Amino acid sequence: MQITIRDIINHLSQIIHDCSASGNKTGYFAALYKRMTAAVLENITAGNFEDADRMERLDIVFAQRYLKAYSAYFSNNPCSHSWRNVFDASKDHSLIVLQHLILGINTHINLDLAIAAAEVAPGDAIHALRNDFYKINSLISSLIDDIQECLSEVWLPMRILTKIANGHQIPVLNFSID
């Protein structure tokens, strides 16, 4: 059976539910990732990419890398050292929500994205991915305000940080994306 982006979103919803029920901090990244994945699906459906089929494949391959790491770790099977560090950190109650998010974001982008892109567009085909790749980066960047608002609802210090930063946080938050 072919997996779809909707299947990915459903799987992320299950992770969020399980993490919420168990108090596992890994759910913060899963919730953020679900929001981003839904936005990518909306843009694929709207025809906002040069090659919608390729972007759907990229999104699925990219997401599966996270889902496989999550499943392996929580089934006591090996996963990459990078993901293991993220999941181990979810047990550290001294970390703030933002730190859990950044750990997940950096690991997923810095480890999984290049591998997924090379798998979907091997060799010289990678160059054809460029424009759509930048469109996804812009899409994710455009979600920053929405994400900050959602984060403020679950983590009250975010409200204060947002007011203090007064927009200066955007380049920092986009660091791994750009």
Language-model region placement:
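Short terminal alpha-helical segments
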Residues: 1-22, 109-110, 114, 141-144
